[in-house]
Design a protein with these regions (language model features):
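Alpha/beta-hydrolase-fold catalytic nucleophile elbow
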Residues: 7, 32-35, 54, 89-90
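Alpha/beta-hydrolase-fold serine-hydrolase catalytic core, especially in secreted/extracellular enzymes
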Residues: 91-94, 100-226, 236-242, 247, ...
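Noncatalytic modules at the cell exterior or secretory-pathway interfaces
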Residues: 323-333
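Gly/Ser-rich "nucleophile elbow"/oxyanion-hole loop immediately N-terminal to the catalytic nucleophile
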Residues: 1-9
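Gly/Ala-rich beta-loop-alpha elbow adjacent to hydrolase catalytic centers
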Residues: 8-12, 16
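A conserved short beta-strand
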Residues: 25-38, 50
Length: 351
């Protein structure tokens, strides 16, 4: 048997990874995990095959959206060569992918159920993406958006937010919290966006239920604040700059407004070129919600934003950075034109 792709929903969304790893003779070509439930740790290595993970915003069953944790495990495998996609489906819920589950999520609250998209619309999204996933994996051995320059914020008439991982050159990473940087009119600090008491990221809320997730939090209170990352990189053989980031919608500095970011490269001769990520870029949008206070102990509350704020991947064609020597890049700079704001930065790569 050849051309094998496994698709699993909920607990089966986790189990397909185990099947592919434990039965190598099956020759699995790709994995599509739908609202996967990470009920126990994986028993071995995760398969190095094209993988897509769908997580619905209003999942009352897998309320921590465990698929984000699986994506992170795949992304941080240094030996991995296959592409990976994480798609956050706004307005989706756990049951909406399947006709076998006709009732709303039994653990979802009334407000979430009211905001959930019609099940027919969610299944149409799932059907279209599944077809495209199968075609892309079998014909190109990659996930559908692996080499797409401008990642969409709409798919099958549904709003989405996407992270995509492909083999790439790391230029900055928040993992380990030890990268060099300088700031001007901005404050930067390393935070742990954890779902536990070890959280240091305030009310910022990632999907995934992480115990540890390193981010660089950048905050500013006046326009044209900057943060710079020194590097020594030859980018002439790459086509795109890729940034994983998110607006911290829980921070009142953002004023419930979308943000914009100017991305600047500087070469060894001091030449600079800039590209603007405009307000409305999916990863820089304000996500509607409010800060919730969860009572803990000794009078302290755990702060949590009512809406998940996933990271999004932004890609910029390197050819858009004109008049710099891409073979001798020495600095990456982010400039924030707005009067005030706050973002979370995970990584900057070239591929």
């Amino acid at each position: 048997m050849d051309q094998v792709i496994l698709i699993g929903h909920s607990r089966a969304g986790r189990d397909i990874f185990e099947v592919a790893e434990r039965l190598p003779d099956l020759g699995v070509d790709g994995l599509l995990a739908v609202a996967p439930a990470l009920i126990s740790p994986f028993s071995g290595e995760l398969p190095d095959v094209p993988t897509s993970i769908l997580i619905p915003q209003y999942d009352g069953d897998v309320s921590t959206l465990d698929g984000a944790k699986i994506y992170d495990d795949l992304e941080n495998d240094p030996e991995r060569t296959a592409s990976t996609e994480l798609i956050y489906l706004k307005g989706g819920n756990h049951a909406g992918f399947s006709t076998a589950l006709v009732r709303p999520d039994p653990f979802a609250d009334a407000e979430s159920i009211a905001a959930t998209m019609p099940a027919e619309k969610q299944r149409a999204f799932f059907s279209q993406y599944t077809k495209e996933f199968l075609q892309s994996v079998l014909e190109k051995q990659q996930t559908p958006f692996a080499d797409t320059q401008e990642l969409p914020d709409q798919y099958a008439d549904c709003e989405i937010l996407m992270q995509v991982d492909v083999p790439a050159k790391d230029l900055f990473s928040a993992v380990g919290a030890d990268a060099q940087l300088t700031t001007e009119k901005a404050a930067a600090d390393w935070v742990n966006a954890s779902s536990t008491v070890d959280n240091t990221a305030g009310a910022f809320r990632l999907p995934g239920g992480f115990t540890t997730y390193d981010l660089l939090r950048i905050r500013w209170d006046e326009p044209d604040a900057e943060i710079s990352f020194p590097c020594s990189a030859d980018l002439s053989g790459y086509t795109n700059l890729q940034i994983d980031l998110a607006q911290d919608s829980s921070d009142e500095r953002n004023g419930q407004q979308d943000q914009q970011v100017v991305v600047m490269l500087q070469d060894a001769r001091g030449n600079r070129a800039a590209v603007t990520l405009p307000a409305g870029t999916p990863a820089l949008r304000w996500q509607q919600g409010e800060i919730e206070r969860i009572p803990m102990w000794e009078g302290e509350d755990f702060l949590q934003y009512s809406t998940f704020t996933p990271l999004g991947t932004v890609r910029i064609p390197l050819e858009d950075f004109q008049d710099v020597d891409l073979s001798a890049i020495r600095e990456i700079r982010l400039v924030f034109p707005s009067d005030a704001g706050s973002i979370m930065l995970r990584e900057i790569q070239a591929f």
